[in-house]
Amino acid sequence: ALDAVGLDHSLHVFPNIAEPDLVARITLKPERDQDSDWLIKLDAIHKRKTVRAGFRDKPLPVDYLIESAADVSTEHAVMCVNCDPECEFEVLAAVQQADSIWSADKHFMRENASWMHPLRKRSRDGVPARSTKLPSSKELWSAPMQFLGSGERRTLTGAVLTDRDAPMDWANSGIVLSNMLNKVAGRGIGAALMSHPLFLAPTHLLIKESLKTESIPQILVRFGYPERSPATPRRPLVDVMLHPGFGR
C-alpha cells in the first residue's frame, strides 16, 4: 500500500528483542514515483476478503494457484498448495476432528468468543466482530465441497510451512500469507483461514502427515471463489501501529 502511493520504505521484523510486542518497524524513505504494478496490488488489497459465506460453484485455476504459491514463498516460509485429493480429504477430516474436540471445550469456546466482540472500548485485542456472521468450519471446511460435477476443483487447500516455530517464523508466515491472499484477490479468489487444528497434537500430526512434510504448518488456507458477503471487519490502524501522532 505504501509503494502504491509512492512512499518507499524499509521493514525490520522484531527490531528490538526486548520488546516482543513490537513485531515490525517501518521506516519511510523519500517519496518516489508510483509503481503501476503496486497500484494493481493496492486494488487487490481493497478486493481481498476472508471467505465467510461459502464458496461459489466455479472452477479454480489450479496452475495459477500453484505458480502464485511458488512466487510468494521465501527461504523463511513456504506457501504449499495441496493438489492431491486424497491428502486434501485427510486434511479436511483433521479439521472436522479438531472442531469437534474444541467445541466440547467450554474454556476454549469462552476464550475464543472473547476475541471476537464489537466493544472496542473494552479491549483492543481480537477481531472486531460487529454484527457480522462468523463462518462455520463445517460450512467452509467440509469435504464434499472439493469438486464440481465436471471434476474441476471448486476449492483447494494449502498451508504456510516453516522449518521452526518461533515468533520470527510466525511473522514470516504472516508476510507470505498476506502476499498470497493479495495476489489471488486480483483474480477474484478468496480464502478461508484455519489454525485451531494445529494447536492439538493429534490433529497437528495428522495434518503434517497428510501434507507429507517435515516442516511445521503455521496456518491452513482453503482457496475458492467466495459467495457475496460483507467486507471483513478490520481493526483501526491505531490499534496495531505505534506512531508519535497516535495515542493509545
Regions found by a protein language model. Name each.
Residues 1-248:
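Acidic, surface-exposed loops and disordered segments
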